[in-house]
């Protein structure tokens, strides 16, 4: 591809050298400014997903644990910021490094003064706390607050960054952008925005947490039959799902990191800006297809049109397409979403049979659909898109697209390694916390609800068991509906 100087030099005649340098520097500054702004805006969108996680989690738990689950979401972001700053970013992107882990930039110390964009740190931190948020849903309603603090710091500061180093760092052993050493199976792993790096990590961690804690009291009866412990607000679940959908447009398209990159000669009007738009489309189609497939699949299974199931199916489709969103065609994204819905339905049925309790279906949704997304990418990645994004013609691409099986081999390896790494690190942590009595709350606290026993009161005023927020019935005001459903009436001057 011709450089700026090569293009402008012949056009400017005798003053070519000075004029070319000046104009090219101006273009470079403008390009850097636009790319940095694009990345920063994408980071804001990904961070807004924390609000979506908070609403989704709040609606999916019972009212008596609402304040607790909301506090854990705040904790994920706040503690995650400090631990990712101190340790996580260095383990993920500290250069120079080896293929396993980064070794520099602890506390952002000695980052390059030229060429380092702080927007990149913010963007990567937003991804790290997303992984921690996934895990919190799996262990909701029965976990001690101190356990949240410990696991969140460990996951954000160490476990997740190591995986992101493997796949997204230029030095990582599985990276498709590796600059030193040979690529895994000659291709590396194409996990563009994190079906494996983010969703599998969070899902597998949640799997171990939920397994070690055991199910919530009342989740299964004495005969072992599943008993639904429904969340208290479908409205919050829908709100959270839409906020997550919105944030995914920063999560997936934002993972290009830059937007002003041309894929052809000057004037071709074809570049990364086109790929960004296509990625948003594939993201939309996968999630939408998964939502509709889940709607009808669960209708056949249960006889109901369940909005909670549809929202979970939607998010499962997004989790699956995240790996290959940039390298597949829109029609392939529909296949991705369709299969991800059945993966989620099947894993939920298996979880009920095995008496596995995950209040938000996070292990099944993020772990299972994330793993499917990594496999899907190895099957449907298109040669043209792979060459454009990684800039090296002749790379392996999707098996079903004629690219052979090397990419699939690399992806199978990384799925197994991610599952093993998270299991090796997070399972012992949860076991130690459990052994020390720091993991699960007491049965009495669980029955009463953590909002009352651990957080000083209920999340909602006028909770049936909370008299502190109710007006005095002896004074003119409102007669409240009782716990037994008596009629609500207004007292105005003694007349009803």
Swiss-Prot record:
This is Ammonium transporter 1 member 2. Expressed in exodermis, sclerenchyma, endodermis and pericycle cells of primary root tips. Belongs to the ammonia transporter channel (TC 1.A.11.2) family. The chain crosses the membrane at residues 39-59, 74-94, 120-140, 148-168, 192-212, 236-256, 274-296, 307-327, 331-351, 360-380, 412-432. It is found in: Membrane. The lineage of its organism: Eukaryota, Viridiplantae, Streptophyta, Embryophyta, Tracheophyta. It comes from the Eukaryota. One of its GO terms (biological process) is ammonium homeostasis. Its main location: membrane. It is a multi-pass membrane protein. Ammonium transporter probably involved in ammonium uptake from the soil and ammonium uptake and retrieval in the vascular system. Induction: By ammonium or glutamine supply in roots. Keywords: Ammonia transport, Membrane, Transmembrane, Transmembrane helix, Transport. PROSITE patterns: AMMONIUM_TRANSP. GO terms for molecular function: ammonium channel activity. One of its GO terms (cellular component) is plasma membrane. The keyword Kinase does not apply. Pfam families: Ammonium_transp.
């Amino acid at each position: 591809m011709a450089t700026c100087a090569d293009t402008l030099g012949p056009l400017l005649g005798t003053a070519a050298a000075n004029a070319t340098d000046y104009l090219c520097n101006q273009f470079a500054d403008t390009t850097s400014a636009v790319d940095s702004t694009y990345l920063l805006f994408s980071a804001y969108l990904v961070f807004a997903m924390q609000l979506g996680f908070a609403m989704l989690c709040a609606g999916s738990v019972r009212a008596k644990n609402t304040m607790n689950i909301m506090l854990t979401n705040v904790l994920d972001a706040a503690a995650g910021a400090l631990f990712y700053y101190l340790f996580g970013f260095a383990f993920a992107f500290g250069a120079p490094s080896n293929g396993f882990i980064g070794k520099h930039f602890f506390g952002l110390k000695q980052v390059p003064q030229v060429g380092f964009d702080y927007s990149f740190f913010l963007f990567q931190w937003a991804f790290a706390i997303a992984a921690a948020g996934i895990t919190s849903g799996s262990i909701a309603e029965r976990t001690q607050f101190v356990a949240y603090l410990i696991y969140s710091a460990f996951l954000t500061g160490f476990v997740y960054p190591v995986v992101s180093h493997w796949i997204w760092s230029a030095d990582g052993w599985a990276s498709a952008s590796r600059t030193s050493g040979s690529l895994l199976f000659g291709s590396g792993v194409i996990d563009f925005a994190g079906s494996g790096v983010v969703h599998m990590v969070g899902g597998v961690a949640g799997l171990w947490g939920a397994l070690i804690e055991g199910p919530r009291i009342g989740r299964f009866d004495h005969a072992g039959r599943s008993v639904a412990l429904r969340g208290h607000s479908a409205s919050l679940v829908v709100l959270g799902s839409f906020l997550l959908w919105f944030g995914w447009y920063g999560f997936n398209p934002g993972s290009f990191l830059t937007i002003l990159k041309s894929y052809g000669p000057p004037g071709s009007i074809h570049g990364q800006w086109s790929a960004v738009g296509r990625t948003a489309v594939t993201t939309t189609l996968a999630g939408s297809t998964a939502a509709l497939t889940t709607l009808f699949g669960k209708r056949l299974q249960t006889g109901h049109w369940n909005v909670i199931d549809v929202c979970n199916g939607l998010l499962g489709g997004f989790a699956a397409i995240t790996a290959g969103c940039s390298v597949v065609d829109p029609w392939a994204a529909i296949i991705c979403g369709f299969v991800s819905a059945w993966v989620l339905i099947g894993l939920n049925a298996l979880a009920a049979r095995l008496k596995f309790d995950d209040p938000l279906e996070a292990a099944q949704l993020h772990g299972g659909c994330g793993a499917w997304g990594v496999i899907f990418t190895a099957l449907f990645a298109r040669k043209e898109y792979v060459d454009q994004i990684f800039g090296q013609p002749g790379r392996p691409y999707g098996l079903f697209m004629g690219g052979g099986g090397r990419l699939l081999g690399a992806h199978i390896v990384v799925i197994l390694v991610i599952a093993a790494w998270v299991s090796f690190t997070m399972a012992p942590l949860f076991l130690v916390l459990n052994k020390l009595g720091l993991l699960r709350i007491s049965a009495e606290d669980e029955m009463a609800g953590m909002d009352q026993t651990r957080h000083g009161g209920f999340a909602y005023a006028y909770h049936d068991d909370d008299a502190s927020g109710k007006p005095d019935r002896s004074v003119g005001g409102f007669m409240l509906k009782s716990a037994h459903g008596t009629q609500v009436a207004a007292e105005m001057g003694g007349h009803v």
